[in-house]
Amino acid sequence: MLTYGKPFNFQRWIDDHAHLLKPPVGNQQVWQDSDFIVTVVGGPNHRTDYHDDPLEEFFYQLRGNAYLHLWIDGKRERVDLKEGDVFLLPPHVRHSPQRPEAGSVCLVIERQRPAGVVDGFEWYCDACGHLVYRVEVQLKSIVSDLPPLFNAFYASEEKRRCGHCGHVHPGKAV
């Protein structure tokens, strides 16, 4: 028998998991214990963090539209992902996926991180652009590892205060 089971209809899988592809969960991993982290992410979803992935990320915008805010050389840039678009993000490019459309669906594929290779999550000051806070994690599960990290940032005014200008990051997007 195959390790990961038989082929299945992916569109049906998405429809069957649609209730998990919207807030508050927003995403679902297709396979567990694979060399790849294959995640389906639904909208709407607004993030204030920037992910520093040590490896490449593949995006396939299946339904609706989305965009990535990129933090490059101290400036925010935007990459639009229209329905049907694919995009390969290089390692260590800080990115913040934004999915404003309800019902939008994106397939995101990442490699499992080798032991000792960590992901970073960063928040930048809206007033001056400096790094406000960074947390690193040995990522095992996107679904379960991230909420505690994000909630710790949202709950702490100290973590959200910019050390450069004193502005307090608003935390979670509304």
From Swiss-Prot:
Residue sites binding Fe cation 1 per the record: H51, E57, H95
InterPro entries the UniProt entry points to: 3hydroanth_dOase (IPR010329), RmlC-like_jellyroll (IPR014710), RmlC_Cupin_sf (IPR011051)
Cofactor: Fe(2+)
EC number(s) per entry: 1.13.11.6
GO MF term (any one): ferrous iron binding
Binding site for substrate: E57, R99, E110
Binding site for O2: R47
Uppermost EC category: oxidoreductase
Reaction(s) catalysed by this chain's protein: 3-hydroxyanthranilate + O2 = (2Z,4Z)-2-amino-3-carboxymuconate 6-semialdehyde
Pathway: Cofactor biosynthesis; NAD(+) biosynthesis; quinolinate from L-kynurenine: step 3/3
Residues binding Fe cation 2, per UniProt: C125, C128, C162, C165
Pfam families named among the record's database cross-references: 3-HAO
Cofactor note text: Binds 2 Fe(2+) ions per subunit.
BP term (GO), one: L-tryptophan catabolic process
UniProtKB keywords: Dioxygenase, Iron, Metal-binding, Oxidoreductase, Pyridine nucleotide biosynthesis
Quaternary organization: Homodimer.
NCBIfam families hit by this protein: anthran_nbaC, PRK13264.1
Family indicated by similarity: Belongs to the 3-HAO family.
Function: Catalyzes the oxidative ring opening of 3-hydroxyanthranilate to 2-amino-3-carboxymuconate semialdehyde, which spontaneously cyclizes to quinolinate.
UniProt-recorded name of the protein: 3-hydroxyanthranilate 3,4-dioxygenase
Species of origin: Paraburkholderia phytofirmans (strain DSM 17436 / LMG 22146 / PsJN)
Lineage: Bacteria, Pseudomonadati, Pseudomonadota, Betaproteobacteria, Burkholderiales
